[in-house]
């Protein structure tokens, strides 16, 4: 699927609010479809595994699906799989080809504990979810929360490695969902904005606004993030029971001004430099929409702030 730049810019000027609402409505229908499919599968398993690469909007989508299930009378619990990261041990941590610790590797997760928890939940037992502090790269003693599923309740586990064979082979009946922002933008049949750039820009803006990371830091990690996606995430997407695109035609117009500032100076020598320097001129092809027009529950609020899921 590809979006048309001329149509995007026309709607940006002529009816920005209507444009946003229409795009958000398409996404909302995908969420509702996923909720219906999850309920149908709940006879087989109460577990939902939601995966997708960085910047796909997994957290918001997981919460929206949980809300859709609640509207159908099904209580849903949410668990972020990031809390299952192991305490980093430099002696045993997986490494990138360059020798750095590979935080994109599924081996950073405590797969044994995850699989035990999935089995315990299916058996009606209580689990105690660990708590991970990214600032110290370690698991803390106190658990983040506990969950015990009652009859007809569902739990949504969200994380980049949720569809990895190390999990799904042991729990084949779990409902598997994959999301990613992946539509290109075209002008006269030519790709002028790559689908992966939606996620790159989302990640760069979010990390700058909320994680104290300057753009050089985020962009320097992008090559390894993409390597990790190709090795550890994308190969498992076809195992999903349902896939959908989480990009929005209007979002670059909303994020344009913030992203333009962050991409105005890309350090030479950075890996994938030739690709990254194409992002700024591509951004200049889009118009601008005031972010105040974006609803508080919109997915892109996960990246620009001001959302109700923060």
Locate predicted features.
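Conserved lysine of the Walker
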Residues: 58
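Post-Walker A helix-loop "phosphate-sensing" segment adjacent to the P-loop in P-loop NTPases
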Residues: 67-77
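Hydrophobic positions on the alpha1 helix immediately C-terminal to the Walker A/P-loop
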Residues: 61-65, 80
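Conserved nucleotide-sensing/catalytic segment adjacent to the nucleotide-binding pocket
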Residues: 77-79, 86-135, 154
């Amino acid at each position: 699927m590809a979006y048309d730049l001329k149509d995007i810019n026309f709607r940006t000027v002529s009816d920005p609010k209507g444009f946003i609402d229409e795009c958000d409505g398409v996404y909302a229908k995908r969420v509702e479809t996923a909720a219906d499919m999850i309920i149908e599968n709940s006879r087989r398993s109460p577990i939902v595994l939601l995966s997708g690469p960085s910047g796909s909007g997994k957290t918001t989508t997981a919460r929206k699906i949980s809300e859709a299930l609640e509207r159908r009378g099904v209580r849903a619990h949410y668990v972020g799989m990031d809390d299952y990261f192991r305490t980093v041990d430099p002696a045993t941590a997986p490494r990138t080809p360059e020798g750095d610790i590979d935080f994109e590797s599924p081996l950073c997760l405590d797969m044994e504990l995850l699989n035990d928890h999935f089995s315990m939940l299916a058996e009606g037992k209580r689990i105690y979810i660990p708590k991970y502090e990214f600032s110290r790269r370690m698991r803390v003693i106190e658990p983040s929360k506990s969950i015990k599923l009652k009859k007809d309740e569902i739990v949504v586990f969200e994380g980049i490695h949720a569809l990895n064979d190390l999990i799904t082979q042991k729990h084949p009946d779990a409902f598997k969902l994959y999301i990613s922002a992946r539509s290109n933008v075209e002008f006269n049949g030519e790709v002028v904005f790559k689908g992966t750039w939606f996620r790159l820009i989302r990640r760069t803006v979010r990390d700058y606004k909320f994680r104290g990371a300057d753009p050089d830091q985020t962009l320097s990690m992008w090559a390894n993030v993409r390597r990790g996606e190709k090795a550890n995430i994308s190969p498992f997407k076809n195992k999903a029971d349902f896939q959908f695109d989480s990009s929005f035609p209007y979002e670059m117009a909303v994020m344009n001004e913030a992203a333009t500032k962050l991409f105005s100076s890309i350090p030479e020598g950075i890996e994938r430099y030739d690709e990254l320097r194409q992002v700024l001129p591509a951004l200049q092809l889009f118009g601008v929409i005031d972010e105040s027009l974006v609803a508080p529950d919109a997915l892109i609020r996960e990246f620009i702030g001001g959302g109700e899921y923060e």
